[in-house]
A protein has these predicted regions:
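Short amphipathic alpha-helical segments
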Residues: 73, 77, 88, 107-110, ...
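Short amphipathic alpha-helical interaction segments
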Residues: 100-117
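A short, conserved structural fragment
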Residues: 116-126
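Short, amphipathic alpha-helical interaction segments positioned at domain boundaries
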Residues: 133-162
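C-terminal scaffold of the Radical SAM
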Residues: 1-102, 156-162
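Short secondary-structure transition/capping segments
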Residues: 1-5, 114, 136
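Minor-groove-contacting beta-hairpin "wing" of winged helix-turn-helix DNA-binding domains
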Residues: 127-131
């Protein structure tokens, strides 16, 4: 079913993996469960005792939550397009998010150029296309757009220098 959905352009991805359903709210039930409602994520507490103690008080057993920023939503749409469809329309991202793609993602494009030289993808004026040789590495390609991974790499690089 997932293969058919990918071929038909109906494949989606969420934090749990691939799906044929787009943007579904996911409710978190159980210890350490993660839920998604709209542009927010919440994770439940991590121990069974704490989970039941909080429920017994009539509260939700949420440990932490985050609300996605406009940048998070932009990057999520790029990562999803690359991982689900193996291509990204630069123009559609610019229109949907009111950005100049090449300016906003100059650093990411520079990183992708090395992958392009390796035959994993192709970048032109309107598209980023994952080539057959890059499909098995699409996760690494998409990770270029993950701001949180980039900041972790920069922090690690800086701390190694010191």
């Amino acid at each position: 079913e997932l293969t058919t959905a990918q071929r038909q352009g109906r494949l989606h991805r969420n934090f749990q993996g691939y799906s044929t359903y787009a943007e579904c709210d996911l409710l978190a039930f159980g210890v350490s469960a993660i839920g998604k409602v709209g542009p927010t994520y919440a994770q439940n507490v991590k121990t069974l005792d704490e989970y039941y103690d909080i429920l017994d008080t009539g509260r939700l057993p949420v440990l932490r939550g985050i609300e996605l920023t406009p940048d998070d939503l932009l990057r999520r749409s790029i990562i999803q397009a690359l991982m689900c469809h193996f291509e990204l329309s630069i123009e559609s991202i610019e229109i949907a998010h009111l950005i100049d793609f090449k300016t906003y993602f100059a650093s990411e494009i520079a990183d992708l150029r090395d992958m392009e030289k390796g035959g994993l993808l192709q970048i032109d004026e309107q598209w980023i296309t994952v080539l057959p040789a890059g499909r098995m590495l699409v996760r690494a390609i998409a990770m270029v757009f993950d701001r949180y991974l980039r900041s972790d790499r920069e922090r690690t690089r800086y701390s190694k220098v010191i």
